[in-house]
Amino acid sequence: MNFEKKLNGILSFTYLALVLCLVMPFMLILVLDTTFTFNKFNLNFVYRQIVELIVLSIFAGFITSFALYNKICRISTEELKRDILENNGLKTIFKIAQYEVMVSIFYSLLLLIILLNKQLLYYGFTAIFQIFFTFCAIFVPLFIFGSLVCRTILLHKIRGTT
């Protein structure tokens, strides 16, 4: 009974991550729209950039998921069950999260270079502020997507379905 409660607690974090994944693109549109309006940039360029950003983030998210799946498969089920009973699964999740952060930062920087290359050529110094917003807009959904996949795979591994 205690094990099932802890498993349901981890599952609730998975639902929270899913909601954040769905909300993040709308927050991204608001931030970029406001920033570009203040700088009098072309809004069509902004919406085209948002579509590119979402497509590339989904692609990078799948690559991140495969990397995380490979890392999770190396963890024994007994060790995972023991960690959930003793530490609510935090030891295992933190071990995977360190790897997840590195992979997410790498792909975020790669996507940032691809997306901002032409923007820096057109807008020069004023694009510096956009670099920060764009990096956050790539990294946060990618990290949340990775966390969601990570927790889902962990739950299936615990139940013995992988």
UniProtKB/Swiss-Prot annotation:
This is Uncharacterized protein MJ0792.1. It is a multi-pass membrane protein. Its main location: membrane. It is found in: Cell membrane. Signal peptide: none annotated. GO terms for cellular component: plasma membrane. Keywords: Cell membrane, Membrane, Transmembrane, Transmembrane helix. The chain crosses the membrane at residues 10-30, 50-70, 96-116, 125-145.
